[in-house]
Amino acid sequence: MSKVAKQYAGAQVYGRLLSYLKPLWKVFALAVLGNVIYALASAAMADATKYIVAAIETPSPEGRLLVPMLIIGIFALRGLGSFCGGYFMARVARGIVHRMRLELFRHLTVLPCRFFDSNSTGHLVSRITYNVDQVTGAATNAITVVLREGFTVIGLMGYMIYVSWKLTLLFLVLGPIIGVLIGYVSKRFRRISRRIQSSMGDVTHVASESIGGYRVMRTFGGEEYEFNRFMKASEYNITQALKMSLTQALSTPIIQLVISVFIALLVWLALSPEVRGNMSTGEFLAYITAATTCAKPIRQLTEVNAVIQRGISAAQDVFMQLDEPVEKDEGSYVADRVQGRLEFKSLGFAYSDEGKPALQEINLVIEPGETVALVGRSGSGKSTLVNLLPRFYDYEQGEILLDGKPLKDFALTSLRRQISIVTQQVVLFNDTVTNNIAYGALADATPEQVREAAKSADALGFIEQLEQGFDTLLGENGTRLSGGQRQRMVIARALLKDSPILILDEATSALDTHAERNIQSALETLMKGRTTLVVAHRLSTIENADKIVVMDQGRIVEVGSHRELIEKDGAYAALHKLQFSEADA
């Protein structure tokens, strides 16, 4: 168990969980009132037994009329209590689910990139869907049973004490015995619940990977492999669920057997004249009815333990994510629009404290409006360097200055407003063309501005040919568009944002040469008047850059124009020869 999970173990988790009830306390109070009414009606039903017996022993017209009315009244009251308790608790449950999911999702949007690097999408989605439902079961469904059946037991026990406190003392011995049994199974329930939640995350993760990569799966014949992977995850989930069911199936009848033995002993003692005393036949039957009626609510109270333990285990997982530290945003400087001068001074960075440095002693100056290309072999640190600009990761060594001001002095929102990013991994949403271009903070853009951005990105032609033009739904990640069309959509989004700094991280590497050539004019339009950093794989696309920075093993090894570096006949020239010799071959 993690430190966070330990910190909020047991009652502390439930206490934090119940804090979600505060905004809904009025509705919750109505649910409690309904359960109290239900419990009182159940106790009244036991007491009504003596009136029924009396009416049978001494028949009278009044008894014949009043006893049936009493029964109808008690059941009507019980029905009212059941309705109020059930309906208002359901409203509380939906309210908690909604609030917790919103809080979880909101927190997810402000977590640092490192968190997403170490957590799979499937597990994160499973927390928002499956785990929150389990938590709600503990917070509401379990409370319904605890309140309704708990008040019922209290009401019946109170009545039994009133009728014969001596007999009832024996019944109270049940408490510690049942408590020991519940304590044992609770630990097992919680342990298995954690495994079930983890396995549900595995199931979701495998399914989402297979669905998202269905083209690769079919192309490479991975259907059987993915099926077996999913089957193993699902079988583990079933195994843990069956262990939970087995524990619950064994604990419930054992507790019921203990209760039945005590009730039998109670009846045996009550039949003794010395113990029974002056109890009438009606009072005796009413007492036995109350004692036997206690069995059902006590059984339900023990069964709900499984729900509570599942909820506590799920809550530990949910609270663990909610307690994850958010992105550091200690800067306060808000810039309207920067000029775009960047300076890297002795910059160093590693993805982990123990890991090998990804960047070492980076010193570089980029003037406003310059186009700087970053080239080098895979793993040389190109993408890492550009990812530090919008502070997706925080650097600890050296400094990055933007217009002479340390990057960490900028408020994150202000800093990221100055930067547009176009990568090889195009992200489009299952929304309209307009909403994909005018995304997020750009939502206030006018239709004319969106259209102009699409035109500048050379996307207007294919957009107008879509069924509903700018109102066409694109499907998940724009599956209805070709690779080049999807890339032009992202360029249109960047044009609409109109940021002074542009990052092109292998923006055309996923396209073929023909598509890349067609999109080049849109990229040139996007780059005009902006400080542009281009992470390039194809050297032919960056020959006109103002400055080419060659990186190797996290260090800058060469800087210069294309002509200067070719004449120097160093690392860049070697890369250039290698790439163009492969192209000729």
Curated annotation (Swiss-Prot):
GO cellular component: plasma membrane
Residue ranges occupied by any ABC transmembrane type-1 domain in the UniProt entry: 29-310
Keywords of the record: ATP-binding, Cell inner membrane, Cell membrane, Lipid transport, Membrane, Nucleotide-binding, Translocase, Transmembrane, Transmembrane helix, Transport
Pfam families, per the entry: ABC_membrane, ABC_tran
Transmembrane region(s): 24-44, 65-85, 143-163, 165-185, 253-273
Major subcellular location class: membrane
Catalytic reactions on record: ATP + H2O + lipid A-core oligosaccharideSide 1 = ADP + phosphate + lipid A-core oligosaccharideSide 2
Location in the cell: Cell inner membrane
Positions contributing to ATP binding: G376, R377, S378, G379, S380, G381, K382, S383
Enzyme type, top EC level: translocase
Residue ranges occupied by any ABC transporter domain in the UniProt entry: 342-578
Mode of membrane association: Multi-pass membrane protein
Known EC number: 7.5.2.6
A molecular function (GO) term: ABC-type oligopeptide transporter activity
Record InterPro entries: AAA+_ATPase (IPR003593), ABC1_TM_dom (IPR011527), ABC1_TM_sf (IPR036640), ABC_transporter-like_ATP-bd (IPR003439), ABC_transporter-like_CS (IPR017871), ABC_transpr_lipidA (IPR011917), P-loop_NTPase (IPR027417), Type_1_exporter (IPR039421)
CDD domains reported in the protein's UniProt record: ABC_6TM_MsbA_like
Subunit structure: Homodimer.
Family to which the UniProt record says this protein belongs: Belongs to the ABC transporter superfamily. Lipid exporter (TC 3.A.1.106) family.
Description of its domains: In MsbA the ATP-binding domain (NBD) and the transmembrane domain (TMD) are fused.
Role of this protein: Involved in lipopolysaccharide (LPS) biosynthesis. Translocates lipid A-core from the inner to the outer leaflet of the inner membrane. Transmembrane domains (TMD) form a pore in the inner membrane and the ATP-binding domain (NBD) is responsible for energy generation.
Protein name (record): ATP-dependent lipid A-core flippase
Naturally occurring in which organism (per UniProt): Hahella chejuensis (strain KCTC 2396)
Gene: msbA
